[in-house]
């Protein structure tokens, strides 16, 4: 029988703090908080006031939030709430600092996870999603999270969908003007598409494709105008290579495909297909998305991940001429090494490149047989090669170690500098959605180009030689390998002046960087290229062939021209249909085609509308938005989800998120604290920043960034157990036995040997512990206390239910210090604490305040335990000492603290009580720095009282290095109070 089970026996005093009493206390205070609106945040204007009927009254705003959850059918396990508890502790702390705290929770309810769960259960997604939300909301409420529940919403709510579609409409109706000044003062800004039309109408901007034919904007048909505008819109339709996943029956964004070329969800193969889809022109914001990272308080690892994903590089755009039967065609390439143009001996295009529509009907004379791939003519060869390429995943195509494949197209490109005639190949390692889908091949300076040249017998020209003092020599490479280096001396790179090519150019003798600058200037003067910036980032594929997502506010006329629906028509709701399952295919069927479930609902698709020129027949777009759409802007809707006139009202936005709205936010503004997993670094976080910047440019919001501070919580891990067959067995039924010869514990299940492994917590691993189990057996406060004490918030930590009882014992001891277990009344003394107590109390206040500011609740808890242990040793517990202790513990274990506060005679909730302030007369005296060593290496330092009890010092030391011990009990702990704790970890 566990200690906790013993504590619930009938012979216990009536007011012993145990699981049953904890539940009574927690239910009582949660009801009070709900009825009084204790955690209501006060808006500046309108009806959203705080629980006492006041408005903000000049209080400083503080906005703390979590990455909102998918409403999974499985509900929560104890690993999920770590971030929620952390943000709740921070929110409660800031309220006690006198700040007006906005802390709310919504639900990310559209998308693939919800749809797949509905398909599995045979119920409509709305039914399952709403049931899941209700269950998850119950679990979170029972945890005692201090949300303003008036601000709760789900992304599937029609009122929310309306504004998601409204934002899409603003993005669709915008273009990126490189010359405009954005609100931050730098160049480049989203502007209304009407301004672009005005530039075309006035002649200020040339009409693409009509620079020389004299046509005016008004001369073009509506369809022609829309085609041109589509090439500028920030949300646009294009036929381009996409990631097609037959196993899921939908296309995926690059960010949703793993490095192995599989779907992030389901792990299905992903193939490259050319399809007509919606995209968002996020690449226009590439530079700003990188540059503005410097102004926000994010973990460096996340900033680095975004910088690498965006992948800004400086190089040149170069135009080659390709001769075809239909005349000369332009082939644009992007290269980071324009200095190597003299070493280009062939060119390669993606199998999807538009130039391959112009291949000749016959092979040119004298083409080597191995260039033809065994095909009778270029048309057959290119078609077959393209089909083969589409059957490969993107990862397979760019695999450096894989066999280099390719074939000649029958076309030749002309080097714009040398005039050399270069054979044009197609190869699947060139991707259409990276760069321009065409590359100049320099086998003397690139390993992949070199391997390709060797395979097809193409010439190799070296244009860079090692530096004279490098100790290296080009002879070491010639005929053997490429010389790959950005630092060297340029050779074999000069051309005489000609009428066709322009001025003479010589790069010989220059260092590489100097050669790049010189050749870029020559390219621009010759009109065949220019220095430019490119990005690894691709435009965001924004449409999905799913049912459970936001419909696009777009309809098409009989001629296929898209039309944006007016705001008055929003929201466009999903039809309530019985057949919502996506059509999936054999995961390896690369030739399959997407089929949007909405296309099967003809009554919804075909509509009669009057869009200003009379009633006509239109057809709705049958794609839906990705699940990222709703999560791109949800943080703003917390400000006022009841507002039917604005996405967010400007005054309220500025109060909660505007630049310098408090001492934390800085010039960029944004949410003060955003807690969530690092796995969203290049998905949700990047997309949200993009949408926010568009809205910022257009004047709808006043902060340049959505989230000022980001904090990535760690992961709660757990042990799982298997039998000798390798099958997982219920972790809660496994019995730990004596250690074996190596000192490791043994385990049995139903009397049979069991094997232990460490990793994630999951239903399939049979090691889930639910919050409901914790509430029933320990209470929410003990659960909160345990999660916050397990180790640093930003590091992963192992769950061990056996260790939870330690937190319960601490709360029991504190309860006994305040409450008589027999009468249930407070029994503290009004006497002034002695000087030793005052010193420990005020040092604890100072130290715990610092820990709370630094989001280190684990070490704060350790210090509170030390203070409580001291109070336990006194003959009578002074009110003046225990009340500050209760206030400091309240953000972590709020229910029991509210109950003790009430029993001490306070009529109001302690949630708005001022945070304790240390009396400086007692701070800093009689303390010493204790060193915590593991295997002789210093791993932590603690400021502790000189007369600290060795047992208390041991507890603080173990808490400080809990993450380094991996959840295991140390083999030995040697305490030399007050200065040294030496730990020998378990092997």
UniProtKB/Swiss-Prot annotation:
Its main location: cytoplasm. InterPro entries: aa-tRNA-synth_I_CS, Leu-tRNA-ligase, Leu_tRNA-synth_edit, M/V/L/I-tRNA-synth_anticd-bd, Methionyl/Leucyl_tRNA_Synth, Rossmann-like_a/b/a_fold, tRNAsynth_Ia_anticodon-bd, Val/Leu/Ile-tRNA-synth_edit. A motif ('KMSKS' region) lies at residues 760-764. It is found in: Cytoplasm. Its EC number is 6.1.1.4. PROSITE patterns: AA_TRNA_LIGASE_I. Coiled coil: none annotated. A motif ('HIGH' region) lies at residues 69-80. GO terms for cellular component: cytosol. This is Leucine--tRNA ligase. Keywords: Aminoacyl-tRNA synthetase, ATP-binding, Cytoplasm, Ligase, Nucleotide-binding, Protein biosynthesis. It comes from the Bacteria. It catalyses: tRNA(Leu) + L-leucine + ATP = L-leucyl-tRNA(Leu) + AMP + diphosphate. ATP binds at residue 763. One of its GO terms (molecular function) is leucine-tRNA ligase activity. GO terms for biological process: leucyl-tRNA aminoacylation. Belongs to the class-I aminoacyl-tRNA synthetase family.
């Amino acid at each position: 029988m566990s200690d906790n089970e013993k504590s619930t026996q009938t012979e216990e005093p009536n007011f012993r703090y145990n699981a049953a009493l904890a539940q009574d206390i927690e239910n009582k205070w949660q009801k009070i908080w709900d009825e009084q609106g204790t955690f209501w945040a006060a808006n500046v204007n309108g009806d959203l006031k705080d629980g006492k009927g006041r408005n903000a009254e000049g209080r400083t705003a503080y906005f703390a939030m979590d990455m909102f959850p998918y409403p999974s059918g499985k509900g929560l396990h104890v690993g999920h709430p770590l971030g929620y508890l952390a943000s709740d502790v921070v929110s409660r702390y800031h309220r006690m600092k006198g700040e007006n705290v906005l802390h709310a929770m919504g639900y990310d309810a559209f998308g693939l996870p919800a749809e797949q769960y509905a398909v599995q259960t045979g119920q409509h997604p709305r039914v399952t999603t709403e049931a899941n939300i209700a269950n998850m909301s119950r679990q979170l409420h029972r945890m005692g999270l201090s949300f303003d529940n008036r601000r709760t919403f789900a992304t599937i709510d029609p009122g929310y969908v309306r504004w998601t579609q409204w934002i899409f409409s603003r993005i669709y109706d915008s273009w990126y003007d490189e010359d405009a000044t954005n609100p931050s003062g730098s160049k480049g800004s989203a502007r209304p598409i009407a301004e672009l039309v005005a530039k075309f109408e006035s002649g200020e901007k040339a009409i693409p494709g009509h620079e020389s034919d004299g046509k005016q904007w008004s001369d073009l048909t509506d369809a022609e105008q829309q085609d041109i505008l589509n090439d500028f819109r920030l949300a646009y339709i294009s036929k381009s290579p996409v990631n097609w996943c037959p196993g899921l029956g939908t296309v995926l964004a690059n960010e949703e495909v793993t490095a192995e070329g599989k779907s992030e969800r389901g792990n299905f193969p992903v193939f490259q297909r050319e399809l007509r889809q919606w995209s968002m022109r996020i690449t226009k914001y590439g530079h700003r998305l990188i540059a503005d990272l410097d102004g926000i308080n994010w973990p460096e690892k996340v900033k680095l991940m975004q910088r690498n994903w965006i992948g800004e590089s400086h190089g040149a755009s170069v135009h080659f001429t390709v001769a075809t039967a239909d005349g000369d065609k332009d082939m644009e390439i992007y290269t980071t090494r324009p200095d190597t143009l003299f070493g280009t001996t062939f060119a390669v295009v993606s199998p999807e490149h538009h130039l391959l529509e112009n291949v000749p009907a016959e092979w040119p004379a004298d083409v080597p047989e191995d260039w033809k791939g065994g095909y009778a003519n270029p048309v057959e060869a290119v078609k077959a090669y393209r089909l083969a390429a589409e059957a490969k995943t993107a990862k397979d195509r760019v695999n450096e170690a894989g066999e280099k494949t390719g074939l000649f197209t029958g076309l030749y490109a002309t080097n714009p500098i040398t005039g050399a005639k270069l054979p044009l190949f197609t190869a699947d390692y060139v991707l259409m959605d990276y760069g321009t889908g065409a590359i100049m091949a320099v086998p003397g300076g690139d390993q992949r180009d070199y391997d390709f040249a060797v395979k097809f017998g193409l010439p190799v020209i070296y244009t860079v030689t090692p530096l004279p003092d490098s100790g290296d020599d080009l002879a070491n490479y010639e005929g053997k390998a490429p010389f790959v280096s950005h630092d060297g001396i340029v050779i074999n790179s000069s051309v005489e002046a000609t009428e066709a090519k322009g001025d003479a150019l010589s790069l010989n003798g220059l260092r590489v960087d100097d050669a790049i600058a010189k050749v870029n200037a020559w390219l621009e003067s010759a009109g065949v290229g220019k220095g430019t910036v490119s990005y690894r980032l691709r435009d965001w594929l924004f449409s999905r062939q799913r049912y459970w997502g936001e419909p696009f506010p777009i309809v098409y006329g009989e001629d296929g021209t898209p039309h944006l629906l007016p705001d008055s028509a929003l929201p466009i709701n999903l039809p309530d249909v019985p057949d919502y399952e996506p059509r999936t295919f054999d995961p390896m069927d690369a030739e399959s085609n997407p089929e949007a479930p909405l296309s099967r609902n003809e009554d919804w698709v075909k509509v009669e509308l009057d869009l200003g020129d009379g009633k006509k027949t239109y057809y709705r777009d049958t794609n839906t938005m990705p699940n990222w759409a709703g999560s791109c802007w949800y943080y703003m809707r917390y400000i006022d989800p009841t507002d039917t006139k604005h996405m967010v009202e400007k005054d309220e936005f500025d109060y909660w998120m505007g630049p310098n709205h408090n001492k934390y936010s800085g010039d960029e503004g944004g949410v003060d604290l955003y807690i969530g997993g690092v796995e969203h670094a290049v998905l949700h976080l990047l997309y949200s920043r993009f949408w926010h910047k568009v809205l910022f440019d257009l004047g709808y919001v006043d902060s340049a960034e959505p989230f000022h501070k980001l904090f990535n919580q760690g992961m709660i891990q757990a042990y799982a157990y298997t039998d000798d067959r390798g099958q997982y067995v219920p972790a809660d039924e496994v019995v730990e036995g004596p250690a074996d010869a190596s000192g490791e514990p043994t385990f049995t299940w139903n009397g049979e040997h069991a094997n232990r492994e460490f990793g994630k917590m999951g239903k399939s691993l049979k090691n889930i512990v639910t919050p409901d189990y914790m509430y029933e057996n320990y209470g929410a406060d003990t659960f909160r206390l345990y999660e916050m004490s397990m180790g640093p918030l930003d590091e992963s930590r192992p769950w061990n239910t056996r260790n939870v009882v330690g937190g319960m014992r601490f709360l029991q001891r504190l309860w006994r210090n305040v409450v008589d277990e027999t009468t249930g009344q407070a029994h503290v003394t009004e006497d002034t604490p002695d000087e030793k107590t005052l010193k420990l109390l005020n040092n604890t206040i100072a130290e715990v305040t610092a820990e709370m500011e630094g989001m280190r609740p684990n070490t704060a808890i350790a210090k509170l335990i030390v203070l409580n242990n001291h109070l336990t040793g006194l003959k009578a517990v002074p009110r003046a000492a225990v009340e500050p202790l209760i206030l400091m513990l309240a953000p972590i274990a709020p229910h029991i603290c509210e109950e003790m506060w009430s029993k001490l005679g306070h009529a109001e909730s302690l949630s708005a009580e001022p945070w304790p302030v240390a009396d400086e007369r007692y701070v800093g005296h009689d303390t010493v720095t204790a060193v915590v060593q593991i295997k002789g290496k210093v791993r932590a330092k603690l400021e502790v009282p000189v007369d600290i009890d060795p047992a208390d010092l041991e507890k603080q030391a173990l808490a400080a290095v809990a993450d380094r011990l991996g959840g295991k009990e140390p083999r030995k702990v040697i305490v030399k109070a007050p200065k040294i704790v030496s730990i020998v970890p378990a092997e």
